[in-house]
Design a protein with these regions (language model features):
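Hydrophobic/aromatic-rich, well-ordered segments within soluble, folded domains that form packed cores
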Residues: 40-60, 190, 194-213, 579, ...
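Bacterial N-terminal signal peptides
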Residues: 8-19
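Active-site-surrounding "flap" and adjacent substrate/cofactor-binding loops of secreted or lumenal enzymes
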Residues: 28-29, 44-114, 118
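Sec/Tat signal peptide C-region and signal peptidase I cleavage site
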Residues: 20-24
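Noncatalytic, helix-rich "gating/capping" subdomain that lines the substrate-entry/channel surface
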Residues: 92-386, 390
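N-terminal secretory signal peptides that target proteins for export/translocation
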Residues: 1-5
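Intrinsically disordered, low-complexity linker/terminal regions across diverse proteins
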Residues: 26, 78, 237, 266-269, ...
Length: 682
């Protein structure tokens, strides 16, 4: 997604649930869907390490499967969801549905990818036409044309584009220009002098050389290594001028409208007309420069790099972008770099899993339409809708009770909250795939066609009214998000089913788990980025100056608190990068706790497995985030991801008074904070 203001939960699990009844029949439900008493380490004091207390035994006995970079509750549910998708695709491939139907396209796409022998037999042949086109480039204008064409098939370029609602006119779609084109995950991988980053750079150099040789672009190993080094040096120059992850969170700075004439004037050195024409943007009068200084600096770099280096760069990006659809040599090279070197994953996923994911990326809503009929019942949707309403009501009461916010800002905040659009389960209108051509027997072309289709689908939106029925996730995704330009919260079907959500579950675990997630997404409308957008989704300042300053004081303290956390030896969390998500975690748990007590209606909750209602609420929250990681992916997440790692997210509880009361946490406990040091924003 282009901006952090469509703020997702990422991929982390929601809650396991447990039964409110203590009957013998319900004890099985507690075991299946409740907090995991067997995974707790009762030798650890909750106040010293709440994550270890809630999840310690589970973490010690859990082994990460070879084809995963991490493993947690989400991983288990993802496996289940992928199994459902596999069944849908397998049935589609056997259905012999009429040509042109979604079922036929899904079946052909999946069956073609699964025909490994046919793909192996073609070797590097599918690349031939694209690489020949790159080889013919003999001017910088043709280079710009090639870059504009490359983004249409999903290749990452130094200047890329995307379509999104206009910040100032969120009822209309517009075009944004952004930075990109790096082979490593982030600029810091090029610029950091740490040993792990140096190792990642060495792995990338070897991978780039391998792609040049496998594709036939470089005639020998020695030649490929030298040419890959020149491409790496080019990317290093790009990394130096690109915006950092933290700087990219400054959304007002990312809204800089430039006219077509502004681009050659403010970013000389690049053939903008050729680029825009090739990208299908020749008639667009205004395009938002979302990283203006980086765009100008990139344009200045272009003519200083020899064309042969640029051509090798384009070839590497082309091969890397679609290597999973080529023969085994390409697949293995791609996996060894992206999954093993960068994420620590030792084993390649089964082919059916890869095929399911690629089909979901290409035709996600076509799969989703079948998925919700089979796996998402009306009872779950109705119960989830009511739960969201309860959390919205609790959020409103929380705003009303803030002692640091003025009445004027509270009124505007309530207006925004009342205007929230809530989407549950699946879209009301399914995506039209009639223009997507799927060719039986050509996996590589199908991948390109899917990317072209998605690009053209978005390009057709430019200048048109925003479709507020559109979803940014498929129903099968175990995730959720808030979109500031639409002022909406979205919860796909897969997160609203057991064991994530059970309409009959214990209130404590349901609210501590999925309730905190819903509260988290609601709060994104008022985090350090979301608060910059009004009830209509427009970038507008609706805060009093005094309230904005009080808010900044609190968020500055939160940055300092999280920046002190060490994730790996010598690797601290970036509290500025993770600020919005940390606000969401801290707000989500207090909103959910308020809603939980409202839902109790004055009733005393039962004690289950020795845990009070308050304790089960916090266990629902903590066990939600239990995950074990391989170090390389954890390092990548700390460098690039606005979410704190899961063990850090569990520490949210130390800012919440009720957690101290639930476990009698006292001075001297490792997580103890004096009341004056507990950060309270919402």
């Amino acid at each position: 997604m282009p901006f952090a203001f469509r703020i997702s939960l990422f991929i982390w699990p929601l809650a396991l649930a447990c039964s409110l009844s203590a009957s013998a029949a319900d004890h099985a439900r507690i075991g299946d869907y409740g907090f995991d008493a067997t995974g707790m380490d009762l030798s650890v004091r909750p106040g010293d390490d709440y994550n270890a207390y809630a999840n310690g035994v589970w973490a010690k006995r859990t082994r990460i499967p070879g084809d995963h970079a991490y493993w947690g509750v989400w991983s288990v549910l993802d496996e289940q969801a992928q199994g459902h998708v596999r069944d849908i695709l397998t049935n589609a491939s056997k259905a012999q549905a009429p040509a042109g139907t979604n079922v036929r396209k899904l079946g052909d796409f999946y069956a073609t990818f699964m025909d490994e022998a046919a793909i192996e037999g073609r070797g590097a042949t599918p690349l031939k036409e694209q690489l020949a086109s790159i080889a013919r480039i003999d001017s910088y204008a043709q280079l710009a044309t090639a870059m504009g064409g490359a983004i249409r098939i999903g290749d990452s370029m130094p200047v890329t584009t995307f379509v999104y609602p206009d910040f100032k006119r969120p009822d209309l779609y517009t075009v944004y220009l952004d930075q990109g084109g790096l082979g490593l995950p982030d600029r810091d991988y090029y610029l950091s002098d740490s040993a792990p980053m140096a190792a990642a750079r060495a792995a990338y150099l070897a991978y780039a050389a391998k792609l040049l040789q496998l594709s036939g672009v470089a005639p020998s190993e020695g030649d490929s290594v030298a040419r890959a080094k020149r491409v790496f040096d080019l990317e290093h120059r790009l990394a130096e001028i690109q915006w950092s992850q933290v700087r990219q969170r400054d959304l007002p700075a990312r809204y800089v409208p430039w006219t077509r004439a502004d681009y050659p004037a403010k970013a000389p050195g690049f053939a903008w007309d050729a680029y825009f024409k090739a990208a299908g943007l020749g008639d667009q009068p205004i395009l938002i420069a979302s990283v203006d200084s980086a765009i100008s600096a990139t344009a200045a770099i272009v003519p200083t790099v020899p064309l042969p280096v640029w051509k090798d760069y384009l070839a590497i990006r082309a091969v890397d972008g679609h290597a999973p659809f080529l023969s085994k040599a390409f697949v293995d090279a791609h996996f060894a770099f992206h999954a093993t070197a960068l994420a620590g994953t030792p084993d390649l996923e089964a082919r059916w899993k890869r095929g399911s994911r690629f089909a979901e990326k290409a035709m996600g809503e076509a799969i989703g339409e079948i998925y919700v009929r089979q796996y998402f019942g009306p009872e779950s949707k109705a119960a989830a809708t009511q739960l969201v309403r309860n959390l919205l009501a609790a959020a409103g009461q929380r705003i009303d009770g803030l002692d640091w916010m003025s009445t004027a800002t509270k009124i505007k905040a309530r207006e925004k909250l009342d205007a929230f659009q809530v989407k549950i389960g699946y879209p009301d209108k399914w995506r039209d795939y009639s223009k997507l051509a799927v060719v039986p027997g050509d996996a590589y072309e199908n991948a390109l066609a899917a990317d072209r289709f998605e690009y053209e689908r978005n390009l057709a939106k430019v200048g048109r009214p925003v479709d507020r029925t559109e979803w940014g996730m498929t129903p099968m995704e175990i995730n959720a998000y808030y979109d500031a330009t639409k002022n909406e919260i979205v919860f796909p079907a897969a997160v609203l089913q057991p064991p994530f959500f059970d309409p009959h579950a214990d209130l404590a675990v349901n609210y501590g788990g999925i309730g905190a997630i819903i509260g988290h997404e609601i709060s994104h409308g008022f985090d350090d980025q979301g608060r910059l957008f009004d009830a209509h989704g427009a970038l507008a300042d609706w805060w009093t100056a005094a309230d904005a300053e009080k808010y900044k004081q609190r968020t500055t303290a939160l940055i300092a608190q999280y920046s002190a956390y060490e994730v790996l030896p010598g690797l601290k969390l970036n509290g500025e990068l993770t600020l919005g998500e940390n606000i969401g975690d801290n707000a989500g748990i207090v909103i959910a706790h308020d809603a939980y007590h409202t839902a109790l209606g004055g009733r005393a909750p039962p004690v289950i497995d020795g845990q009070s209602g308050e304790q089960r609420f916090f266990l629902g929250f903590a066990q939600n985030w239990r995950t074990v990681w391989r170090d390389p992916i954890l390092r990548q997440i700390v460098t690039t991801d606005p979410h704190s790692p899961d063990a850090i997210r569990v520490r949210t509880v130390r800012n919440f008074d009720s957690w101290y009361a639930a476990y009698d946490v006292k001075p001297g406990d490792a997580l103890y904070l004096a009341p004056s040091e507990r950060i309270r924003i919402w």
